[in-house]
Every structure is written in structure tokens, then in C-alpha cells.
């Protein structure tokens, strides 16, 4: 998959997609995922690091 910017609701959708039933922890102020996927493009595999 090509790297892409994932911000806001798109980022949440990507987390639901890759984490599925495992769920994920979404605390924007304590996570680097916004910097990793919104400020700079990330692959769709990167959000998996934030699954429960």
C-alpha cells in the first residue's frame, strides 16, 4: 500500500480497519500516531502498532 496522510476520522477508520475486534487505544495527546500518520504519510501497516 502506498503511504498516505491519515488524519482525524480517516485515521480512526484506518485503526478500525487494521485492528478489527482487537480494538485500539486512541489518546491523541499521548500517541505518536498523529505525528506518524497525519503530519507525515504512513503506510496502512503503521496504525497496527496502536492496536490493543
Curated annotation (Swiss-Prot):
GO CC terms: extracellular space
Chief localization: secreted
UniProt xrefs under InterPro entries: Insulin, Insulin-like, Insulin-like_sf, Insulin_family
A GO MF term: hormone activity
GO terms (BP aspect): glucose metabolic process
Covalent S-S links between cysteines: 7-38, 19-51, 37-42
Lineage: superkingdom: Eukaryota
Keywords from the named record: Carbohydrate metabolism, Disulfide bond, Glucose metabolism, Hormone, Secreted
Localisation per UniProt entry: Secreted
Stored CDD domains: IlGF_insulin_like
Subunit-level organization: Heterodimer of a B chain and an A chain linked by two disulfide bonds.
Family: Belongs to the insulin family.
Protein function: Insulin decreases blood glucose concentration. It increases cell permeability to monosaccharides, amino acids and fatty acids. It accelerates glycolysis, the pentose phosphate cycle, and glycogen synthesis in liver.
Protein name: Insulin
Organism: Polypterus senegalus (Senegal bichir)
Gene designation: ins
